[in-house]
C-alpha cells in the first residue's frame, strides 16, 4: 500500500475536515485546548456590558450585606449569574458564534452550567491566579468534552492586565503536571475587548497578575452536557423567565432540572410529546 500524500504532510490517510468557522475553532480546541474568537461583540456593546457588570457587582455586594461579608467567603470579586440581574447578559450567554462552537464539541443539547463576572483587580491577588479547571477536583479525562468555557473579555487581556494563562493540552491528562513542566508549558492568551477565549473546561488555567492600575473584567460561561448540574439553578434564580422560549429554556436548563415527584416527571415527559 503506497503512502498517501496531502499538502504539508505525508503518510496521512485520515484528516480532519473543518467546513465552517465553528468547526475549525472546535478542532483547534480539541487539539490545543483553547482558541480565541476575536471581535465577537462591538466596542460600544463591550463598554455597555462593562458598566452593567459593575452595577450587578454593586447590587450583589449590597444584597449580601457588604464587601467584607463577601470577602470572608472569597467571593468579593465575582458577580454570579449576572443574566439574572440584567438581560444584556442573557444575550451574551446566547451568543450565536459561541453556541455554534459548543454544539460542535458537545452536541446539540447544550446547557449553561454557570455564568460569572470575574474582576481581576490591579495589584491584588485574585483566587483565580491559582491553576484550576472549571470542573474542579476532577482527575479524569473523557474522549469527548463534557463542558466548554467561554471567557468574554470586557477589558484587554495582556501581559500588563493579567492575561489568562493556559497549559495547552492539559485537558487530555488526568494529573496536574509537575511544577517545572507546568512552568514550561504555561502560555499567556492575549485577547482584545469583545473577544471570547473559548476552551475545554478541563484545561488547567489561571489568571495572570494585573499590573495595569485598573481592574480587568470578564464574564465566564461554562456550557455543559445536560448530565452536569448547574452551579446555581437558573430556572429557580430566573423564577420562570424565558421558560416559554424553547431555545433559552433548553439553554438555561428548564428541561433538565430534577423533577419534584414521580407525577411531575411524567407530566414533563407528556408535555415534551405534545410539543
Where are these regions (language model features)?
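Catalytic core of non-heme Fe(II) oxygenases with the double-stranded beta-helix
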Residues: 126-190, 228-238
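Short, solvent-exposed loop/turn segments at secondary-structure junctions
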Residues: 42-43, 118-120, 157-159, 171-172, ...
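Conserved double-stranded beta-helix
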Residues: 2, 173-198, 202-203, 208-275
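A short, structural micro-pattern
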Residues: 111, 144-146, 213-215
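Aromatic-acidic/polar surface patches that form glycan- and anion
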Residues: 42, 90-94, 143, 183, ...
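Non-heme Fe(II)-dependent double-stranded beta-helix
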Residues: 2-32, 38-131, 136-138
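A structural signal for short, well-ordered beta-strand segments
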Residues: 115-117, 150-152, 219-223
Amino acid at each position: 500500500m503506497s503512502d498517501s500524500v496531502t499538502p504539508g504532510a505525508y503518510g496521512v490517510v485520515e484528516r480532519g475536515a473543518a467546513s465552517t468557522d465553528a468547526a475549525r475553532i472546535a478542532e483547534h480546541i480539541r487539539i490545543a485546548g483553547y482558541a480565541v474568537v476575536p471581535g465577537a461583540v462591538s466596542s460600544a456593546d463591550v463598554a455597555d456590558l462593562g458598566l452593567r457588570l459593575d452595577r450587578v457587582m454593586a447590587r450583589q455586594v449590597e444584597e449580601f450585606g457588604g464587601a467584607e461579608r463577601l470577602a470572608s467567603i472569597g467571593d468579593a470579586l465575582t458577580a454570579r449569574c449576572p443574566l439574572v440581574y440584567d438581560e444584556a447578559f442573557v444575550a451574551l450567554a446566547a451568543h450565536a458564534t459561541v453556541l455554534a462552537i459548543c454544539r460542535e464539541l458537545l452536541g446539540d443539547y447544550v446547557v449553561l452550567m454557570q455564568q460569572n463576572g470575574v474582576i481581576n483587580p490591579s495589584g491584588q491577588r485574585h483566587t483565580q491566579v491559582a491553576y484550576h479547571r472549571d470542573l474542579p477536583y476532577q482527575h479524569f479525562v473523557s474522549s469527548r468534552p463534557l463542558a466548554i468555557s467561554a471567557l468574554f473579555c470586557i477589558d484587554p487581556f495582556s501581559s500588563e492586565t493579567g492575561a489568562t494563562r493556559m497549559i495547552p493540552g492539559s485537558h487530555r491528562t488526568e494529573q496536574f503536571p509537575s511544577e517545572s513542566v507546568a512552568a514550561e508549558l504555561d502560555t499567556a492568551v492575549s485577547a482584545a475587548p469583545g473577544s471570547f477565549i473559548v476552551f475545554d473546561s478541563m484545561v488547567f488555567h489561571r489568571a495572570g497578575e494585573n499590573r495595569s492600575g485598573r481592574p480587568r473584567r470578564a464574564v465566564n460561561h461554562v456550557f455543559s452536557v445536560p448530565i452536569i448540574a448547574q452551579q446555581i439553578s437558573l430556572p429557580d434564580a430566573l423564577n420562570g423567565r424565558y421558560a416559554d422560549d424553547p431555545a433559552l429554556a433548553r439553554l438555561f436548563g428548564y428541561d433538565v432540572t430534577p423533577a419534584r415527584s414521580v407525577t411531575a416527571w411524567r407530566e414533563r415527559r407528556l408535555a415534551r410529546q405534545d410539543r
